[in-house]
């Protein structure tokens, strides 16, 4: 049976691991160290570690694999293939070149578009109507390896980064399992990435999280769903942070200054730069838990003045 080392960390990686383990001999799982989570800073294992332990697979958690003694242990396993999915570290050539069939990665974009750590976020932020997953060779340069297979999936206005992560996680596992038989048999010729079409999905900055109400409504709508459920887009209300977790978009122009409020007893609408409307549905005022807008408008939101504007 084909011996595989799997490397991954978040929930996205779990379906890939479980599918691999159902058919192949996964001899080791490498994931990030346990990290403190939440206000109480409870030391929490990554989702992949939990899944690996349930499957009785040995787990490695080096802080930095490149300089870890565990690197030689992994090479000594003499695996036939290394598979990664959102592991979170650049891997050294000594490991990439050690398996018989090399090292491949499940990447959540249609490469060469969106190389980097936040491809799903950027597909939503940029208003794409489709994205997908790519199986590609691992090289030391970030997400630059030749492409082995690729599969597309639509993005709807109802999607956000969270829903797309779930869909792409399943799609990636399916594509990998469909690809591996021919790949291991040497029947697939990989395709180099077109350097003219390369784009990058770098980690989201704090500045990208802040809503600029002078921008068009569609752009703001894409920002909100592209940053939901993490790190979450925010604006300010009376100089205090105000997060918008979920919203809809109305392509009707009501007039009013950017950030102006149109509200009734149960709904809240905010004017964008082109006059179209953002309609928040789940929000989080400063110092409060997230809530639906109806709860906000029947509580603290009742005191909103028509002269109040978001972003001020």
UniProtKB/Swiss-Prot annotation:
Enzyme Commission (EC) number: 2.1.2.9
Positions of (6S)-5,6,7,8-tetrahydrofolate binding: 109-112
GO biological process, one term: conversion of methionyl-tRNA to N-formyl-methionyl-tRNA
Disulfide bonding pattern of the chain: none
GO cellular component: cytosol
Homology family: Belongs to the Fmt family.
Function: Attaches a formyl group to the free amino group of methionyl-tRNA(fMet). The formyl group appears to play a dual role in the initiator identity of N-formylmethionyl-tRNA by promoting its recognition by IF2 and preventing the misappropriation of this tRNA by the elongation apparatus.
HAMAP family in the cross-refs: Formyl_trans
Catalytic activity: L-methionyl-tRNA(fMet) + (6R)-10-formyltetrahydrofolate = N-formyl-L-methionyl-tRNA(fMet) + (6S)-5,6,7,8-tetrahydrofolate + H(+)
Gene Ontology MF annotations: methionyl-tRNA formyltransferase activity
Species classification: Bacteria, Bacillati, Bacillota, Bacilli, Bacillales
Identification of the protein by name: Methionyl-tRNA formyltransferase
Keyword Ribonucleoprotein: no
The keyword Protein biosynthesis appears for this protein: yes
Entry-linked NCBIfam families: fmt (TIGR00460)
Gene: fmt
Record's keyword terms, sorted: Protein biosynthesis, Transferase
């Amino acid at each position: 049976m084909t011996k595989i080392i799997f490397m991954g960390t978040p929930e996205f990686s779990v379906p890939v691991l479980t599918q691999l383990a159902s058919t192949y001999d996964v001899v080791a799982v490498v994931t990030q160290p346990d990290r403190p989570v939440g206000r109480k800073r409870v030391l929490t294992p990554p989702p992949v570690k939990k899944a690996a332990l349930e499957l009785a697979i040995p787990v490695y958690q080096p802080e930095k694999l490149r300089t870890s003694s565990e690197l030689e242990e992994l090479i000594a396993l003499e695996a036939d293939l290394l598979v990664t999915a959102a592991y979170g570290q650049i891997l050294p050539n000594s490991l990439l070149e050690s398996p018989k069939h090399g090292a491949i990665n499940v990447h959540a974009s249609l490469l060469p578009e969106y190389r980097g750590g936040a491809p799903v976020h950027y597909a939503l932020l940029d208003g794409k109507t489709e994205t997908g997953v790519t199986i590609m060779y691992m090289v030391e340069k970030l997400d630059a390896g030749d492409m082995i297979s690729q599969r597309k999936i639509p993005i709807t206005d109802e999607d956000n980064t969270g829903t797309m992560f779930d869909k792409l996680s399943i799609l990636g596992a399916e594509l990998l399992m469909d690809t591996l038989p021919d790949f291991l048999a040497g029947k697939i010729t990989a395709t180099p990435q077109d350097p003219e079409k390369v784009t990058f999905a770098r980690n989201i900055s704090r500045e990208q999280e802040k809503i600029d109400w002078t921008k068009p409504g569609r752009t703001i709508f894409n920002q909100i769903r592209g940053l939901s459920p993490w790190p979450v887009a925010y604006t300010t209300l009376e100089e205090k942070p105000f997060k918008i977790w979920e919203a809809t978009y109305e392509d009707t122009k009501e007039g009013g200054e950017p950030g102006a409020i149109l509200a009734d007893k149960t709904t809240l609408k905010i004017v964008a730069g082109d006059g179209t409307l953002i309609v928040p549905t789940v929000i989080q005022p400063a110092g409060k838990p997230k809530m639906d807008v109806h709860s906000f408008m029947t509580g603290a939101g009742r005191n909103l003045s028509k002269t109040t504007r978001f972003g001020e």
